[in-house]
């Protein structure tokens, strides 16, 4: 039996909302409790820094071990938009293994074959192969009958359906949010209500079927209002957002900055403020990186031709910590958003420092200043935060008690 004592640590406990100066005890890769280090234990001196659950990044589009390690991410929920699509048990099983030994990968199986939005995928066999949820990928299922069957089938399996919320009839060819910025730049745009229309339909179907629904990114005031109302009615819905939609508005695409071309697109300032309020009041359950790195060949193109997406894994922690420094949320609440809540969406018994949980741990310095540089990121440097001053760095990282950073 191997016992490790993490001493001189400030423990961030998302369950219970506490910060404690205690010693954390780990035995054979599992948290056993808090207390004095037993004789013969391996001692890790944390130097007074913060020790928290490793980040569970829900909604990642590419397995990127170096970027995840640098960002304090121990587990990822891998989106089904892979090549090949995660709609086959063999493909799902291989995807679950490719992060070893440094990263837990939890595949999100495709809800429909080839993510085409027509025929249901073989969800049950994908679950047996390791899928932890099912998803619609980068797009919305337009056929309400298909989405109803997806939710009903997933509900029978106890799975969460992870949905992209943009009405394709309005947003299909859009690259920006309708408004002053898009008009000035002459960009094809869609009204922000495209999100609310998609959310409203999916919420009604989730309520009808009793299934668990996670809207991966909600970015508009009207969308948050719908989520709040549904939660009050008892609908089993959760929602997420990325730091980009919390810290940037559509002004960031001025001068046709393709690194700020995202999906869903950046919104106007009023929607950004609504997003910050939704994080503060508990409407938002998850903050994820939306990690979707692209090389210059995909981004250094005319805005309408550039790929949507950004490299986000390495900057997730410092950008999320800005919410704590701005006193919008507490540090324990932040790690509920980054670890325990996304774990719960995926049906994982992790993301906390409670006894019996896997010792997925991150030691970090919340005050360490650095400058985001696309050229220096571990993954492709397509970040809209290039040149942005931030604070917060992962110092050491453990996966089931084994150090990986």
Language-model regions, residue ranges each:
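N-terminal metal-binding scaffold of metallo-dependent hydrolase/deaminase domains
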Residues: 1-38
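Divalent metal-coordination and catalytic microenvironments
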Residues: 9, 24, 29, 48, ...
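Metal-associated gating/positioning segment near the N- to mid-region
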Residues: 45-99
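Alpha-helix-loop-beta-strand connector modules within alpha/beta enzyme cores
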Residues: 89-105, 152-163, 315, 319
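Histidine/acidic residue-rich metal-binding segments in metalloenzymes
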Residues: 118-287
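His/Asp/Glu-enriched, well-ordered alpha-helical/loop segment
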Residues: 184-212, 280-281, 286-287, 292-367
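C-terminal cap of metal-dependent C-N hydrolases
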Residues: 357-405
């Amino acid at each position: 039996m191997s016992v490790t004592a993490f001493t001189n640590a400030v423990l961030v406990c998302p369950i219970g909302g506490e910060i404690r100066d205690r010693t954390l005890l780990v035995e054979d890769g599992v948290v056993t409790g808090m207390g004095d280090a037993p004789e013969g234990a391996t001692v890790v001196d944390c130097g007074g820094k913060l020790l928290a659950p490793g980040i569970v990044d829900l909604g990642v589009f590419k397995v990127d071990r170096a970027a995840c390690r640098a960002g304090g991410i121990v587990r990822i929920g891998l989106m089904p938009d892979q090549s090949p699509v995660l709609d086959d048990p063999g493909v799902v099983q291989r995807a679950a293994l490719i992060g070893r030994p440094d990263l837990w990968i939890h595949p999100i199986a495709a809800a429909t074959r080839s993510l085409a939005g027509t025929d249901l995928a073989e969800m049950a066999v994908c679950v047996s192969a390791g899928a932890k949820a099912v998803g619609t990928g980068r797009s919305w299922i337009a056929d309400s009958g298909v989405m109803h069957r997806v939710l009903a089938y997933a509900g029978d399996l106890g799975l969460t359906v992870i949905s992209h919320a943009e009405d394709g009839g309005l947003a299909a060819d859009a690259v920006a949010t309708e408004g002053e910025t898009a008009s000035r730049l002459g960009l094809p745009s869609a009204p922000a209500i495209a999100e609310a229309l998609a959310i409203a339909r999916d919420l009604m179907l989730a309520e009808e079927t009793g299934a668990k629904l996670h809207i991966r990114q909600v970015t508009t005031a009207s969308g948050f209002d719908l989520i709040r109302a549904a939660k009050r009615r008892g609908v089993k819905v959760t929602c997420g957002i990325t730091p980009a939609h919390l810290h940037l508005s559509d002004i960031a695409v001025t001068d046709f900055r393709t690194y700020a071309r995202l999906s869903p697109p950046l919104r106007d300032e009023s929607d950004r403020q609504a997003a910050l309020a939704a994080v503060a009041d508990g409407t938002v359950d998850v903050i994820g990186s939306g990690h979707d790195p692209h090389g210059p060949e995909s981004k250094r193109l005319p805005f309408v031709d550039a790929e949507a997406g950004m490299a986000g894994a390495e900057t997730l922690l410092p950008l999320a910590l800005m919410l704590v420094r701005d006193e919008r949320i507490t540090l324990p609440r932040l790690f509920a958003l980054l670890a325990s809540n996304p774990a719960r969406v995926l049906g994982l018994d992790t993301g906390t420092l409670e006894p019996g949980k896997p010792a997925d741990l991150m030691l970090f310095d919340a005050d360490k200043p650095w400058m985001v540089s696309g050229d220096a990121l571990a993954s492709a440097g397509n970040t809209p935060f290039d040149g942005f001053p931030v604070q917060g760095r992962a110092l050491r990282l453990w996966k089931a008690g084994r150090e990986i950073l």
